[in-house]
Each structure stands twice: as C-alpha cells, then as structure tokens.
Amino acid sequence: VFVDPIHESMDALSVAYSLLKSHEVIDLLIIMLGTNDVKERFNANAACIGAGMERLILKAKSVDCWGTRAPNILVVAPPRIGDGFHDAVMGEGCVEKSKGVAEQFRIVAERQNVHFLNAADCEFNQVDFMHLTRKGHAQLADLLAKKVPTLL
C-alpha cells in the first residue's frame, strides 16, 4: 500500500481503480500483498500493514466493477520472511514484523467480511527468503484450488 520512493509503482492503492475497472466484471478479487510493506523505510508495524490492507479492501469495494453482485474478495497472507534474511534494503526488523502480518490480515478480513487464506506454510526460497519456490507455488496453487471454487 505504501508509496516506495525507491521502487516505482509498488503500491497497489494507486493502481487499484484502473486495474479493477479494466477487468470488470470482477467475480473474485484475490489480493496477496504485504511483504514489501515490512520495509524499514515505511516504519510500519504489522497492525499498520493490516490497516493498509483494510484501506485497499475498502478501495476495491468502492469501485463499480462488481456488476450486480456484492464485492467478493479473498485476502491471502504471504509467508513470513525467513529467519535467515538480512538485507539492507528491507532493513532491520523486517523478519520480526512479517511474523504478525497474517494475523492482522485475518482480523481485517473478518472485520471487512471478506475471505481469508493464510499461505504461511508455502515454501519460500533461500535466496531472498521472501519469494516462493517452485514447490511453494505448487502449495499455493493447491490451497487456491481448494478455496476459490467455494467462493464462486
């Protein structure tokens, strides 16, 4: 959600309207964000990152892209950053902050009456300790294959 002064166009909020309108009618919006928001330069804790997700959900709900149906949104919490990760760009504390993101997203999803899926157990790589491996992508695909049909 946060505007990154180093990496252009990394904030979902500023592009949400155009993306949703260009793909209407939306049957199901799946949002899997949050890892970049733990960067030290944003000075945001897990609760603040959850508030950012809530703001994005509210934005998505407000866009006239749902046809005659109510907004149907699935929030997917990404795996937490691995303990072996140390990177100057992400900054100190990103590993610890990432541990609380899934719970905050669950709370926000419940409050906003949207769906929630925790991808915490999907395997991430040992290079940047954030992005999914081939196996992790397969695990996420399995989770989504079970969840998505129940939402449509």
In which residue ranges do the predicted regions lie?
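Alpha-helical cap/lid subdomain in secreted, periplasmic
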Residues: 9-152
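Acidic/histidine-rich helix-loop elements
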Residues: 1-11
